[in-house]
């Protein structure tokens, strides 16, 4: 029976039996010839199973001929593929690494066998534990096709390789195409928007420089502010302010711990950017005279490493709200996912259904708050402010919800510049939660923002009576004392407040005020605090302590006209110095009070007054009537008349005057002094560690963001003309966009 089957089947059974009797991994030659039981079977197998031999296949010569044809065809096909660049080998190479199953670094037949279960992984590729090895090996053997023709398996392997190759190449091309299509392309708008974490304000022009404008505490008793002769910023009560009016109140800049910004959405607000911050000087200045003893203040890192006090999760649900918790959670989930419009609708529906639900009302306020930021809408923000009030006024509102609602209401009122409204909200908070010192500290800030130092002082005294170690209260109380010119009394409060490391105390202005107070009482420890402020990143250097800066500007105390690039302005001033002098003397002779006393408490003693022609880039028309030729002379020099961070003014100083060491507010300007009436001896100015004197008809140029000090020990008055100019490295765009100081 077997020979007949061989004759009909062409030797297929012989091959199968041979494979079955031998090992599963026999060679292809063995598998193809098989082990026949009779010579007849071998002969029939040789002739393809047909008795006359004509249809049993090809002869040996024919087989060789066809083999050569196929081989040559393969060679020429390969040449064609390479020559015509049909396959991008750069794209194929390395793409099959993921299929390297045997660990030999490439993908080949052995890898395919492993993937198909015909071969074990190399030891380096085994990922299963030893105890599972035997079981896994057995499974692989079971999966192997028993009795299968090995030649057929090899063909299948080759087919698998080709399919995997095609799949890999096409997949990679698809992925690249998808990546290019799906990758967000940079848009022009990306360069026009403010990259603020809150994303609250209007888009700015390309290249706009953002400024760190921090809270301004306006005080009645002005302190040395490191802003020599500068008029300070306008009051934050924006509802009553007139942008066209010149600033008339001298304020003292001081930070709020929360860094609340007082600004309507409609107005562009300048935030700190990577281009602005503390200016870093590349120039080495001799600090050898500065004391560098250690100060026992916890570093910022140490403060951050201190484990925070675990806060209790606020309880925002009353008994009724707990019954609708699922609906509240669903609406809140929309808000947290950024689906603001949907969340607003959801909470509005909840408020409609459950008008007495404090949590629903509070959620509505939060959504309106978020929507105001998204749309940059003052109107929506005002709605949010009212809704926060409504949530706090509902009966049976949880105390935590009342506190959070009113606190946020106060913050958003401050944001809009509604300082009085914010103060009323803070007063109510303190009445409801009299033991919460944090709220009292915020109330003190509210009074300072309105310029009510006396009320703020009382608040901080109350806080310190209850919690004597409250660092936030100490630095603010010390600041108020210094503003009242109680220099010695302010020092321990400022010092201990900074040393506490409490939130809101690590601010450059507190370091400055402490150092300034120490300098005034002759305490050389002042420079230790300046050094620490520099190390903390608040000051560019021990000498350069301005707070409103643009990073990367050249920093050096003294400049030459050539270095500034404003040689024409300098030449014009020096050519016309007598004209400028004569008009200044005429204004003095009129004795109409046009020269105003310096009112920033920068003098230790003496008499120092100024007559201002330009301030913050705005011309004083009335003042220029007293010096018309001088004003006409300056009109063509926009680097000074357009300098919104400086002034143009006459400065007269009488004998016996000493101006404390102080620092200007910004590194964005340079200051020119033109000598008009200079006594032969006794007048000098120090900037950083170099002291110079004035000459009549000559211009001195220095960077007043560096510490400087003035002495007038002559026997007659000294008159100079002060001209501020933009720092020469500021771009035109920066000069347009930087806010005025």
From Swiss-Prot:
| Top-level taxon in the UniProt lineage | Eukaryota
Q: Which reaction does it catalyse?
A: L-aspartyl-[protein] + 2-oxoglutarate + O2 = 3-hydroxy-L-aspartyl-[protein] + succinate + CO2
Subunit composition and interactions = Monomer. Isoform 2 interacts with CASQ2.
Q: This chain belongs to which protein, by name?
A: Aspartyl/asparaginyl beta-hydroxylase
Summarize tissue expression. Answer: Isoform 1 is detected in heart, liver and ovary (at protein level). Detected in heart ventricle. Isoform 1 is widely expressed. Isoform 2 is detected in heart and skeletal muscle.
Stretches forming TPR repeats: 324-357, 365-398, 437-470, 472-504, 508-540
Residues where Phosphoserine is found: 15
Q: Which gene encodes it?
A: Asph
């Amino acid at each position: 029976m077997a020979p007949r089957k061989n004759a009909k089947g062409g030797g297929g059974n012989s091959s199968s039996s041979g494979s079955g009797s031998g090992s599963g991994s026999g060679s292809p030659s063995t598998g193809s010839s098989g082990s026949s039981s009779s010579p007849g079977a071998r002969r029939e197998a040789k002739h393809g199973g047909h008795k006359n031999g004509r249809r049993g296949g090809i002869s040996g010569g024919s087989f060789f001929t066809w083999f050569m044809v196929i081989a040559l065809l393969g060679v020429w096909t390969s040449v064609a593929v390479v020559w015509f660049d049909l396959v991008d080998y750069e794209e194929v190479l390395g793409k099959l690494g993921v299929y390297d199953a045997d660990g030999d670094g490439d993908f080949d037949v052995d890898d395919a066998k492993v993937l198909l279960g015909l071969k074990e992984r190399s030891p380096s590729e085994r990922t299963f534990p030893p105890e599972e090895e035997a079981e896994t090996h057995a499974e692989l053997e079971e999966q192997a096709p028993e009795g299968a023709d090995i030649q057929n398996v090899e063909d299948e392997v080759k087919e698998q390789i080709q399919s995997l190759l095609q799949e890999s190449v096409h997949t990679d091309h698809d992925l690249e195409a998808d990546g290019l299509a799906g990758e967000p392309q940079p848009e022009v708008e990306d360069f026009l928007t403010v990259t603020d974490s809150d994303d609250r304000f209007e888009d700015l022009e390309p290249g706009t420089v953002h400024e760190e404008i921090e809270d301004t505490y306006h005080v009645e008793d002005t302190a040395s502010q490191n802003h020599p002769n500068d008029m300070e910023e306008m009051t934050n009560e924006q509802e009553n302010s007139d942008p066209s009016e010149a600033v008339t109140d001298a304020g003292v800049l001081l930070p709020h711990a929360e860094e609340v910004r007082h600004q309507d959405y409609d107005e562009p607000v300048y935030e700190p950017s990577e281009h602005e911050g503390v200016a870093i000087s590349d120039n080495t200045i001799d600090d050898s005279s500065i004391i560098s003893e250690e100060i026992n203040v916890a570093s910022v890192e140490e403060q951050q490493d201190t484990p925070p006090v675990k806060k209790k999760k606020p309880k925002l649900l009353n008994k009724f709200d707990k019954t609708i918790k699922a609906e509240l959670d669903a609406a809140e989930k929309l808000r947290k996912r950024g689906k603001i419009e949907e969340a607003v609708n959801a909470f509005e529906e909840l408020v409609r259904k459950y008008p007495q639900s404090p949590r629903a009302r509070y959620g509505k306020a939060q959504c309106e708050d978020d929507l105001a930021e998204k749309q940059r809408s003052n109107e929506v923000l005002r709605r949010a402010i009212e809704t926060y009030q409504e949530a706090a006024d509902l009966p049976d509102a949880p105390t935590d919800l009342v506190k959070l609602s009113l606190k946020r209401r106060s913050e958003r009122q401050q944001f809009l510049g509604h300082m009085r409204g914010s103060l009323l909200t803070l007063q109510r908070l303190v009445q409801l939660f009299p033991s919460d010192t944090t709220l009292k500290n915020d109330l003190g800030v509210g009074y300072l923002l309105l310029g009510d130092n006396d009320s703020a002082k009382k608040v901080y005294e109350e806080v310190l009576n209850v919690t004597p170690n409250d660092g936030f209260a100490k630095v603010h109380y010390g600041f108020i004392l210094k503003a009242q010119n109680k220099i010695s009394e302010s020092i321990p409060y400022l010092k201990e407040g900074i040393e506490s490391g409490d939130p809101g105390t690590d601010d450059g202005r507190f370091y400055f005020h402490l150092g300034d107070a120490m300098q005034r009482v002759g305490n050389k420890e002042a420079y230790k605090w300046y050094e620490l402020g520099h190390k903390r990143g608040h000051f560019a250097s021990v000498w350069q302590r301005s707070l409103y800066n643009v990073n990367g500007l050249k920093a050096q105390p003294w400049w030459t006209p050539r270095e500034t690039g404003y040689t024409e302005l300098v030449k014009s001033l020096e050519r016309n110095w007598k004209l400028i002098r004569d008009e200044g003397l005429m204004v003095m002779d009129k004795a109409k009070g046009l020269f105003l006393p310096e009112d920033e408490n920068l003098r230790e003693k003496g008499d120092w007054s100024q007559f201002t022609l330009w301030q913050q880039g705005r011309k004083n028309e009335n003042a220029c009537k007293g010096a018309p030729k001088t004003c006409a002379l300056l009109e063509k020099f926009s680097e000074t008349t357009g300098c919104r961070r400086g002034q143009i003014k006459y400065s007269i100083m009488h004998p016996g005057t000493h101006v404390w060491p102080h620092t200007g507010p910004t590194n964005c300007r340079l200051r020119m002094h033109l000598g008009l009436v200079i006594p032969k001896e006794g007048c000098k100015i120090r900037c950083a560690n170099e002291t110079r004197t004035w000459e009549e008809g000559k211009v001195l140029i220095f960077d007043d963001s560096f510490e400087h000090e003035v002495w007038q020990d002559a026997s007659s008055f000294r008159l100079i003309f002060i001209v501020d100019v933009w720092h020469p490295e500021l771009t035109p765009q920066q000069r347009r966009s930087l806010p005025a100081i």
